[in-house]
Amino acid sequence: MKILNKILILILGVCLSMGAVFVGGTAKVSAEKGLKNNLTVSGGTLTESDNGYNGTEAVKLTFNGKTSVLRVKNNEINALKTFDTVTVEFRLKYDGTGYNNTLRVYKAEGDLVDYGYPANVWNKVRFKTMVYTENGENFVKVELDFAANKTAYISDLKVTASEEDKPLLGGVKLISLESITLAMGYVVITPDNKVIVIDGGYVGGDTDIMLKLLRTFTHKVDYWFLTHFHTDHTTVPAQLIEYQDIEIENLYYDFPTSQMVKDLSSDSDYPFCDKFEDLVKNNPQKVKNVIKPHYKDEYKLGEYVTMKVLNNAWYTERNGNYGNNSGIMFKMETPGESVLFTGDMGDRGDVYLNDEWSRKEIESCTLIQMAHHGQNGTSDAFYNAIKDIKVCLYPAVDWIYNNDNGSGFNTANLDSLHIRDLMRERGVMNIYTSGMGRKIIL
């Protein structure tokens, strides 16, 4: 598939970990003495160290320049096939003097794992990648970006091989727009060529990005779902309906009236509710069917995807976070894993956990769209209720993801770093944000 400029394409064909193929289940490259013997480096130098995590062996990496690329090699890795999926795990500590929180970890080729790691403490790093082959020898890449003459320590390193016969979403492709605003938009392409969109983004640059992407596949959207009425989620579909030749076969949304929002909150987006309703009614040639989702509704979207409605939309209680809390959460079921789209859901997410059916549906999802752009959304209890989070989807540009008010990392008053730490401690391996230019993910 062609990767369009300004479009973040996440082809979630990551293979499920079905158990290691190595004898004993895991290929530990952190032998009692010999971690350094399993590593080679370009762009830096490696020395042995006893300063490892919990007393284990470590290697000290000194950066020659900004980027150092490690290659992990051993007999077990060499027994695998090129492009086999593996999980890499290690502990990382670095000297942050003058460069605190700036170290970045990549899988390879600019494919970012994460950044913003706290300095001078042991951070847990875990991600899926693939086996590379060069000159008949297999290896796994880990790329670190930092600063010349700075040091980092790597300890407790292990590589686990996993079967690659089961794509994460069963062949369904999930595409996240690389938003230039703080907006949210996801496109789903199924093996039977159904085009599904969730939200869409903010008027302006996001409209052009979405339009280019949709025209790559079709001039028609089969199913378009809107979580709530806020303009950073909905003005892109509004622009396409009003000004472009995109046809929407089925549009799913349920907004309160503008007057209701005005009466129950101080939300400044309240005029958009009625404007959008009028726009849809006045363009029946572009919007063929309008469906108002309700609690427990299920929609079969072709042969491969089912969308479930986990809660009713707006309510009649005054609330300072009314716009976000009036949204709908959708669960997308595929032949593989299930995806939870939370939109901007706030503290009302906990209310839906009290409903037996909703809780069961929520806790069984494994790919999670982080609520309200990954900060000040649903509670820790909401995320902790989800049993096995494999992937976090952040509809967040860099300044939100890094809590940056323009003065650098962690200088704003957002909740994003707390949520990132929560996911990191749970060992989530794959974190995707709309503010990072990603390549195709395995």
Question: Model segments located where?
Answer:
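Sec-dependent signal peptide cleavage junction
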Residues: M18-E32
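Extra-cytoplasmic beta-strand recognition segments
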Residues: L39, V59, V72-G98, V125-T129, ...
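Extracellular carbohydrate recognition and processing domains
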Residues: E109-E137
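Extracellular beta-strand ligand-recognition surfaces/modules
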Residues: R126-K158
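Active-site-proximal loop/helix segments of hydrolase catalytic cores
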Residues: E178-G185, P191-F217, F225-Y243, L310-I400
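Binuclear metal-ion centers of metallo-dependent hydrolases, dominated by the metallo-beta-lactamase
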Residues: N250-Y252, P256-N324, V391, A396-L442
